[in-house]
């Protein structure tokens, strides 16, 4: 996905060339009227935003996911590249609070006997400062937790969920339901806990890594072999959306009473986290619209240019 939403600083970063025909990486600040260009040089026309530091001052960009491409660290205020990290394959990288460290899972395929160790590097030197030596296949997600300056990431085999702490540089396994194969993990926008999703079950955990509640869609819905695959959040902590893969549906849950509604996505090619109690939807022609999770009202969206 070429769009990343920064809930803490109420910003959205996107590759405008992909959607609107203009080169560069852009930022929509929702406390200001217009979007501004962070990197406008044509040299960066193929670069995507990969991670955002929680302090809002640093972003990481690169050309391709899952390759040995350099990772560029960018100062958002100065709108310039401040450092380049070479010789690492960053898959779903995650920055710490200050943008001084980068965590990433690595390529792995248990069926081909390919294993990689999740690692953390110093953003200034590019030196590896922590690794997890565990032979398993890693999931395609990382979820930064601002409260603890940590990142959650999943594995295909038990333990299913791990946490890396940027301050102590330590890894730990998180106790989860062993019957659930985790597909996605997201930190709640109010930073009071996090969600994980797998086996058509959505689980909410508090900051002490204890389960608070769950919704079992296997029991509530006849999904006919289809899989709830990913979680998408807005800045409203009471609403969570989960995506039914191959089904073109969103299940939108109200966590106050655990009721939920369904929304037909139709021929959409993607969606993204967004602000103002909404998700951002992308159609086959790369037009953007917002979907209000409470009212299910959909409106066209085009960030105003500076």
Model-predicted segments: where are they?
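A short loop-to-beta-strand structural motif that recurs across blades of beta-propeller domains
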Residues: 24-26, 70-72, 117-119, 160-162, ...
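Short loop/turn segments that connect beta-strands within beta-propeller blades
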Residues: 29-33, 75-79, 122-126, 165-169, ...
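Residue position within the beta-strands of beta-propeller blades
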Residues: 14-15, 60-61, 104-105, 153, ...
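Blade-level signature of beta-propeller repeat domains, shared across WD40, Kelch, NHL, RCC1
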Residues: 270-306
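A short beta-strand motif characteristic of beta-propeller blades
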Residues: 34-41, 80-85, 127-133, 170-177, ...
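Short, solvent-exposed loop/turn segments at conserved positions within beta-propeller repeat blades
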Residues: 18-22, 64-69, 110-116, 154-158, ...
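Conserved core beta-strand positions within WD40 beta-propeller blades
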Residues: 11, 57-58, 101, 150, ...
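Repeated scaffold domains used in trafficking and secretory/extracellular systems
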Residues: 1-6, 44-52, 87-97, 134-145, ...
